[in-house]
Amino acid sequence: MTILPFAVSHLETLVLQPAQAAWQGELCPDSLQALEATGEAWSLLVRQRIIGCGGVQEQGGGRGLAWALLAQDAGPAMLAATRVVRRYLQASPYRRIEAATACSFAPAARWAAMLGFSSEGRMRAYCQDGGDAERWAYIIPDRQES
């Protein structure tokens, strides 16, 4: 697995898992360009193919918002991806990193828990389709504000 700086073009070849497929046409080009410019986003390359993109968007006050888009066949690479993301979380400048997972997609919640996030509860009607989401947080209490 190779970790690359995120580029908007990486999303063009990424065939998203069905639970995330609705996002493909909803991603704002300006937002994607901003993610690319920040340097706080990466892509995972396996056998010369992008299998996932993700990162953390700064929210101010020492907070970040985690995001990830994964290929439908990313499963075999998830152990290695989990290790990479854990290392990032442990070294990140944020004291709090937030994430949301669709309640209808249990594997996302399992991955958040494996990464060390703690559930903060259900957010009603949060998802694009009107479905509920679970809010997660990764907290490092002694981390200085970024």
Task: Please identify what each model-predicted range represents.
Residues 54-62, 123:
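A conserved beta-strand-loop-helix scaffold within acyl/acetyltransferase catalytic domains
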Residues 39-57:
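Conserved beta-hairpin
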Residues 22-41:
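Active-site rim helix/loop that mediates acceptor-substrate recognition in acyltransferases
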Residues 1-28:
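Short amphipathic alpha-helix that is part of the acyltransferase structural core
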Residues 61-73:
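Conserved acetyl-CoA binding element of GNAT-fold acetyltransferases
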Residues 100, 118-133:
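Conserved catalytic-core motifs of GNAT/GCN5-like acyltransferases
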Residues 92-103:
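Conserved GNAT acetyl-CoA-binding A-motif
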Residues 75-90, 110, 114:
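Conserved acetyl-CoA-binding loop-helix of GNAT-fold acetyltransferases
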